[in-house]
C-alpha cells in the first residue's frame, strides 16, 4: 500500500524540497507499508526547535512540523531526522528518546540525498 504525503505551509520551493526529501527518505529508510499510511508535513514557524514528529490521532498516520527558518541543508536534514522518528514509531524500536539514532544518521543521509542531485 502506498504512503501518502500531504504538505502544507511554507513557500512553494520549500514544499517541493520537502516532497522530494519525503519521497527519497521513506524509500531509503525502508519505510514501507502493508496498510495505507498518511504523513502530513506542515512547514511553519516553531517556537524553539527545528522540527517534530508525532503520531496522528488516526492510527498509522503521522504529523511532522518543520521550521522554515533554517538553511536548505538543515531543512532537508530536519525532514530526514523526523522521518527517522516515523520509522522508529512504526517499528516500535528506539533507545531513550530516539535522538541518538537520528543524530547519527540525519546529516549522513542528507549528504547522500544532496549528492544524488535530486535537490
Task: List the model feature ranges, each with a label.
Residues 2-58, 62, 111-114, 118-119:
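Auxiliary, metal-adjacent structural segments of Zn-dependent hydrolase domains
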Residues 8-10, 67-69, 89-91:
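Short strand-loop junctions, especially beta-strand C-caps/beta-turns
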Residues 78, 82-86, 90:
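Catalytic glutamate of the conserved HExxH
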Residues 93-119:
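Post-HExxH zinc-binding segment in Zn-dependent metallohydrolases
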Amino acid at each position: 500500500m502506498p504512503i501518502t504525503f500531504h504538505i502544507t505551509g511554507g513557500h512553494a520551493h520549500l514544499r517541493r524540497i520537502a516532497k522530494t526529501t519525503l519521497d527519497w527518505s521513506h524509500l531509503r529508510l525502508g519505510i514501507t507499508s502493508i496498510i495505507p499510511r498518511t504523513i502530513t508535513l506542515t512547514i511553519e514557524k516553531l517556537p524553539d526547535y527545528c522540527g517534530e514528529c508525532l503520531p496522528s490521532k488516526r492510527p498509522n498516520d503521522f504529523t511532522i512540523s518543520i521550521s522554515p527558518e533554517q538553511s536548505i541543508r538543515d531543512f532537508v536534514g530536519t525532514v530526514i531526522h523526523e522521518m527517522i522518528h516515523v520509522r522508529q514509531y512504526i517499528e516500535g524500536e528506539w533507545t531513550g528518546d530516539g535522538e541518538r539514532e537520528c543524530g547519527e544518521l540525519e546529516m549522513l543521509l542528507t549528504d547522500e540525498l544532496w549528492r544524488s542531485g535530486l535537490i
